[in-house]
């Protein structure tokens, strides 16, 4: 009654997960028995005097195995009549050993699924504690319950982990890998994965060897190679733990791909170091040849795994070309070829994780072009489901195996391992980031460095590698396993639970949940082509150049072999537009918005439909003239500052330009021309009305030169619209003043009136000229001795510079021949 009243007092959101846990634990009761359902000792004692009963298998009656054929009771009356004794047909029978293995597997998977449902039903728990932490706690509780009833808890075998639980998680990560972010940051990822892992392994192994020398009698017998082996196991960042934590905090794409990419690509380093130190530990003496071979094995393991993955990816893509009539089996090829790539790599002791990633990345674009939309949906959801279940089982069995395993605790060794792991991670990230930022355009800020260092989580890969150690060759493997479990629990619980509040506290940029529109995708591709052209012009071949080369090779050769039909010949931009338009149409139909579709013909339609012409409407409002002038001024002022060289750009790597000296001379001439133009602008008169900008004037004159015919009696500026930015495109035509306007016969008052009339009626840019000065004199007006006073006053008036123009208002007008 007390239990029932306690359950009734819970709120509905808390009752549901509690019932799920109870149902799962009740389902696990048969597993708690050692070998299925067996009678209790009391029952067997009571029935001890009775002979063993016969067990029926189907419709055949068999005698118990402990009775010999001679000791069977014989019914003489039945024998005489030639009849055999028969039992009644068994209506109900129990044979747990027959279904034990699949039944227990199903129960564990059911427990994992119920736990995931229960955690997300209570939002207060899932928002504070990561799912991986809760799953480990459930594993600890289940393992403790199994051990409390006197049974041995199941242990996470390394073969089960590496062959069945890990491949789905890596395949899901490799198949849906954000390829653009991965390739743009591949150099940074490789430095963190290779150099960072080597630093952690040797730094941790060397310091732990020093600790063992002064740590006491229990750990004095651990040698240098044993400590280096232990450092190689514990140094690698675990992809399962990183995925479980980073997907919940929704960190930005850059940090996510850096940490997750490091956890994927450090597998080759971990495998090589593990096998290398495991072999060296059995040698009496390690020579230079062994070290060189170990160094070469890194390239064999990593590049060999990539090669195996690429081969299986190409085969999978080629096979999907012929599945147009059998759509049902299309998803199966993706799973089988990927899994065979992993097994083939493990067969030759290559990196299976690298093989899975390479196969998923290579096959995806070609397979998705060949298979149907339903098959693509099946692949997506099956991979997500498979990887989620595997991840849940890994964390649950990690908790159960902690209870089931044998441990050897040493405070000095365990605490030193935990402390040195944190120090090595921080120092490695800081040092490598300082080096990487010298070559990156987008620098890694101190906040980014903190998240990268804090996100170096350890997980089940280190636990399984520690469990693989042979106790005969490594007597201290129990101590290693205890230290590994301590580091895993600290990183998952402490760092995993505190990383979300720290991200919010530091205001780290989060991932954008909204997808990019068609406009953004098209402009992104346009910018890629533009940057490729810029790299070709300056001779700096970056990743845009090689990406363009690879795309051209892919379009010219690979697509024709791996993609069926006309899809291989379709331009990428048009194919993407078709895909996005179809996606939007499907979403519109599913949302019930068909009544709002306009009656305009689609450009994708294959039918020749001629609808009624609809009145064209301007989507965006027209900009005002003031706003347009403001934008032009901003562009003119800022486009001059784009002549900057990146830090990764080195002019000494370019081919020597024979025209560089001529270019420098041209720049000097332009600088002198600008100085001359500043002097000329001082002699410009200001019209009465507001003038258009020089850019608008050039455009107007270039479009219709006859409509703006200048006056014949004034000096004008002739503009060549074909090349407005060339110094030779502007010519100053000085026409002689008709009838010697400035002569003595003209009166000063009349000259002033004519000048005012010219300023009122002129709509263009007018330049007044003065008499050329003699050589060796400056531009200051000096009257000649023969000039009359009226002529001197007129020329002094004309030489008045007037008000200066606003800075940055017009573009320079450079006279020809200066």
Curated annotation (Swiss-Prot):
Which post-translational modifications are recorded for this protein? Ubiquitinated, leading to its degradation by the proteasome. Ubiquitination is reduced by CHP1.
Per the record, where are the segments of Polar residues compositional bias? 785-794
Q: Where is this region: Interaction with PPP3CA?
A: 684-687, 715-720
Give the InterPro entries listed for this entry: Cation/H_exchanger_CPA1, Cation/H_exchanger_TM, NaH_exchanger, NHE-1-like, NHE_CaM-bd
Provide the protein name.
Answer: Sodium/hydrogen exchanger 1
Q: Name one Pfam family in it.
A: NEXCaM_BD
| Chain segments annotated as transmembrane | 99-121, 131-148, 159-176, 187-215, 223-249, 253-283, 288-322, 329-341, 351-371, 374-404, 411-438, 445-469, 476-505
Annotated region Disordered: where? 39-76, 739-818
């Amino acid at each position: 009654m007390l239990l029932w009243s306690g359950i009734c007092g819970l709120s509905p959101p808390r009752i549901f997960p509690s019932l799920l846990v109870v149902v799962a634990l009740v389902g696990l009761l048969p597993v708690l028995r050692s070998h299925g359902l067996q009678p209790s000792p009391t029952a067997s004692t009571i029935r001890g005097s009775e002979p063993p009963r016969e067990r029926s298998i189907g419709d055949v009656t068999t005698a118990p195995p402990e009775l010999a054929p001679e000791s069977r009771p014989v019914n003489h009356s039945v024998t005489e009549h030639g009849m055999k004794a028969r039992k009644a047909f068994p209506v109900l029978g129990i044979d747990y050993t027959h279904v034990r293995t699949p039944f227990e597997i199903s129960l564990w998977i059911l427990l994992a699924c119920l736990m995931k449902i229960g955690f997300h039903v209570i939002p207060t728990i899932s928002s504070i504690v990561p799912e991986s932490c809760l799953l480990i706690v459930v594993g600890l509780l289940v393992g403790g319950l199994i051990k409390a009833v006197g049974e041995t808890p199941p242990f996470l075998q390394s073969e089960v982990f590496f062959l069945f639980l890990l491949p789905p998680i890596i395949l899901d990560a490799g198949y849906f890998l954000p390829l653009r972010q991965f390739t743009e940051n591949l150099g940074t990822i490789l430095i963190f994965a290779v150099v960072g892992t080597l630093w952690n392994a040797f730094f941790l192994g060397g310091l732990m060897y020093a600790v063992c020398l002064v740590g006491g009698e229990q750990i004095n017998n651990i040698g240098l190679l044993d400590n280096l082996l232990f450092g190689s196991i514990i140094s690698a960042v675990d992809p399962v733990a990183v995925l479980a934590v980073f997907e919940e905090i929704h960190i930005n794409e850059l940090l996510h791909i850096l940490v997750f990419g490091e956890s994927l690509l450090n597998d080759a380093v971990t495998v090589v170091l593990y096998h290398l130190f495991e072999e060296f530990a059995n040698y009496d003496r390690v020579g230079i040849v062994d070290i060189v071979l170990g160094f070469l094995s890194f390239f064999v393991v990593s590049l060999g795994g990539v090669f195996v993955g690429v081969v299986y990816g190409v085969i999978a893509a080629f096979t999907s070309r012929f599945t147009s009539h059998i759509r049902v089996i299309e998803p199966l090829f993706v799973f089988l070829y990927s899994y065979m790539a992993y097994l083939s790599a493990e067969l030759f002791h290559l990196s299976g994780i690298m093989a899975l990633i390479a196969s998923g990345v290579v096959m995806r674009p070609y397979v998705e072009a060949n298979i149907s939309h339903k098959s693509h949906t099946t692949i997506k959801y099956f991979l997500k489901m498979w990887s989620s279940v595997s991840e849940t089982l890994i964390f649950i069995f990690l908790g159960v195996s902690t209870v089931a395993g044998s441990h050897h605790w040493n405070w000095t060794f365990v605490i030193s391992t935990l402390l040195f792991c944190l120090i090595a991670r921080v120092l490695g990230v800081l040092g490598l980031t300082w080096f990487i930022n010298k070559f990156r355009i987008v620098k890694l800020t101190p906040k980014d460095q903190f998240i990268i260092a804090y996100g170096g989580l350890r997980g089940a890969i280190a636990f399984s590698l520690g469990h693989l150690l042979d106790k005969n060759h490594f007597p201290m493997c129990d101590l290693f396993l205890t230290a590994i479990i301590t580091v895993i629990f600290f990183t998952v619980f402490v760092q995993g639970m505190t990383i979300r509040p720290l991200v919010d506290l530091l205001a780290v940029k989060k991932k954008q949940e909204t997808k990019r529109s068609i406009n953004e995708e098209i402009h992104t591709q346009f910018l890629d082509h533009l940057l490729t052209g810029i790299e070709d012009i300056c001779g700096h071949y970056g990743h845009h150049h090689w990406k363009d080369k690879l795309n051209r090779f892919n379009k010219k050769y690979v697509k024709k072999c791996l993609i069926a039909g006309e899809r291989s010949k379709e331009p990428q931009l048009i194919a993407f537009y078709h895909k996005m338009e179809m996606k939007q149409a499907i979403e519109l139909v599913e949302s019930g918005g068909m009544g709002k579709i306009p009656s305009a013909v689609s450009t994708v339609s294959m039918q020749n439909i001629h609808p009624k012409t609809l009145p064209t409407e301007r989507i965006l409002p027209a900009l005002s003239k003031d706003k347009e002038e403001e934008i032009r001024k901003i562009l003119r002022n800022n486009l001059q500052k784009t002549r900057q060289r990146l830090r990764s750009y080195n002019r000494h790597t370019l081919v020597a330009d024979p025209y560089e000296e001529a270019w420098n001379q041209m720049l000097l001439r332009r600088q002198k021309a600008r100085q001359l133009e500043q002097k000329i602008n001082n002699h410009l008169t200001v019209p009465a009305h507001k003038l258009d900008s020089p850019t608008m004037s050039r455009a107007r004159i270039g479009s219709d030169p006859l409509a703006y015919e200048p006056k014949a009696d004034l000096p004008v500026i002739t503009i060549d619209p074909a090349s407005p930015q060339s110094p030779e495109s502007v010519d100053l035509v000085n026409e002689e003043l008709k009838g010697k306007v400035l002569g003595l016969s003209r009166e000063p008052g009349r000259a002033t009136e004519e000048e005012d009339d010219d300023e009122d009626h002129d709509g263009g840019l007018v330049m007044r000229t003065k008499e050329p000065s003699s050589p060796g004199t400056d531009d200051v007006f000096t009257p000649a001795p023969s000039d009359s006073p009226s002529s001197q006053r007129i020329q002094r008036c004309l030489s008045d510079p007037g008000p200066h123009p606003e800075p940055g208002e017009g573009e320079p007008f450079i006279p020809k021949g200066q």
